[in-house]
Amino acid sequence: MEEKIMTNNSPWILTSSTTTTTTILLSLLFTIFIILRRNKSSSSKMVWPTGPKTLPIIGNMNILGGTALHVVLHNLAKTYGNVMTIWIGSWRPVIVVSDIDRAWEVLVNKSSDYSARDMPEITKLATADWKTISSSDSGPFWTNLRKGLQNVALSPQNLSSQSKFQERDIIKTIQNLKEEAKMNNGIVKPLDHLKKAMVRLISRLIYGQDFDNDEYVEEMHHTIEELIRVSGYARLAEAFYYAKYLPSHKKAVREVLQANQRVQNLVRPLLSLNSPTNTYLHFLRSQNYEDEVIIFAIFEAYLLGVDSTSSTTAWALAYLIREPNVQEKLYEELKNFTNDNDRKMVKFEDLNKLQYLQAVVKETMRMKPIAPLAIPHKACRETSLMGRKVNQGTRVMVNIYALHHNQNVWKEPYKFNPERFLQKNQDGVDGKAMEQSLLPFSAGMRICAGMELGKLQFSFALANLVNAFKWSCVSDGVFPDMSDQLGFVLLMKTPLEAGIVPRM
């Protein structure tokens, strides 16, 4: 019915169409009011740390955009304190910690109190109903799954046995980069090459088999990219209670379901492989988990392992391009070591002997922590923070980026300076303070399960790529863009392009 407004010696009279619309709007506003009141009531049982002033419905969302979230929160902490409350929408407060002492309280000293997770609802579709290491609350299931990954697939013996295969992989990566450079006037995009090498490595640890055929590697790589793309919708639903009813969110659910099916189609046929006893697949099957749990435990290893290591390596190469003196100093260390030991490449057993390499690795992870906000923790019981009561269910986020850029710990924190890790004492700041503040893999009981693998592969790839090539800008004076893009991990907003010249 067409909407009309009539005057008839009486107040404004609205036709049925307008009345219906008004009723719906009033009902919606009333519902939102009840939800906000309910959440405000439940939140009032504890005294929340101070934070920015909130707006109705959107909370603090108006000040959280414009740049990477971890940087915004780091800057806000300078005004509101190193323990502050941020409202993601008007119904989800989160305590943000940017201080090393409070971070250790949450992550280490009271690790079991803050060991639960609070994941966006849409992530259920890609985690077998939150039955993966990163998504599940701590408990017997989580403990068993984590031990299986760390003590079986990622055991020191197993990682050591991979060295000859990884040496072959890096030789193949170097050859592929040479071929790409030959076809593109010396210009390469290294990220995809690094990702495919990581897919191969993780595949061997999971299945105990080598994938010489690139079809599985390509498909897994593409599936990871697709799931990362659609996961961005989860943030909208996390911020606004009614966002899950929007067409865009429903579309996202359909796309995640499609990605879910792709994962299952990719992994399920491999569940029947006759895998060795030292593989992740063998462990998972021995626990009699449902197939879906096994499939997404396997996919999680790819999801969190591939992008994290390859992106960190790309960040390091970008810094070395911007700091040619650092690159040459690193190359001199690598060249002298390989010459002295009559080797053409750096091997795994060499990595801890190369002090400057390890300094570059640490400085890259300090500057660009792969998970700058980690995965938010949730209090699984009533506990405390700074002596103040914290309710069960409270979300706490530790800003790793802020810890890594604290000027009281790090001299010139925004400068890429590997030498800081080679100095016993820098202007009164001791090495212990730096060690405690450097948490690229988080800390405590929920520290990254793949930490050792990540550090080894990053160091190994970086050493051999710098030993093989001189890395430079694609054109004079055009340095790599160091802008962040935060997805599952911290990515380069503009994927790295570089000029390479073979050194040998």
From Swiss-Prot:
EC number: 1.14.19.64, 1.14.19.68, 1.14.19.73
InterPro entries listed in its UniProt record: Cyt_P450 (IPR001128), Cyt_P450_CS (IPR017972), Cyt_P450_E_grp-I (IPR002401), Cyt_P450_sf (IPR036396)
Main location: endoplasmic reticulum
Molecular functions per Gene Ontology: (S)-canadine synthase activity; (S)-nandinine synthase activity; (S)-stylopine synthase activity; heme binding; iron ion binding; monooxygenase activity
Tissue expression from the record: Expressed in roots and at lower levels in stems, leaves and plantlets.
Record membrane topology: Single-pass membrane protein
Residues that span the membrane, as ranges: 16-36
Compartments, record wording: Endoplasmic reticulum membrane
Noted pH dependence of activity: Optimum pH is 8.0.
Domain of life the protein comes from: Eukaryota
Binding residues for heme: C448
Keywords: Endoplasmic reticulum, Heme, Iron, Membrane, Metal-binding, Monooxygenase, Oxidoreductase, Transmembrane, Transmembrane helix
One Pfam short name: p450
Catalytic temperature dependence: Optimum temperature is between 30-35 degrees Celsius.
Cofactor(s) essential for the protein: heme
GO biological processes: isoquinoline alkaloid biosynthetic process
Reaction(s) catalysed by this chain's protein: (S)-cheilanthifoline + reduced [NADPH--hemoprotein reductase] + O2 = (S)-stylopine + oxidized [NADPH--hemoprotein reductase] + 2 H2O + H(+); (S)-tetrahydrocolumbamine + reduced [NADPH--hemoprotein reductase] + O2 = (S)-canadine + oxidized [NADPH--hemoprotein reductase] + 2 H2O + H(+); (S)-scoulerine + reduced [NADPH--hemoprotein reductase] + O2 = (S)-nandinine + oxidized [NADPH--hemoprotein reductase] + 2 H2O + H(+)
Cellular component, GO annotation: endoplasmic reticulum membrane
Biological role: Methylenedioxy bridge-forming cytochrome P450 involved in the biosynthesis of isoquinoline alkaloids. Converts (S)-cheilanthifoline to (S)-stylopine, (S)-scoulerine to (S)-nandinine and (S)-tetrahydrocolumbamine to (S)-canadine. Can be involved in both sanguinarine and berberine biosynthesis. Catalyzes an oxidative reaction that does not incorporate oxygen into the product.
Record family assignment: Belongs to the cytochrome P450 family.
This protein's name: Trifunctional (S)-stylopine synthase/(S)-nandinine synthase/(S)-canadine synthase
Source organism of this protein record: Argemone mexicana
Gene: CYP719A13
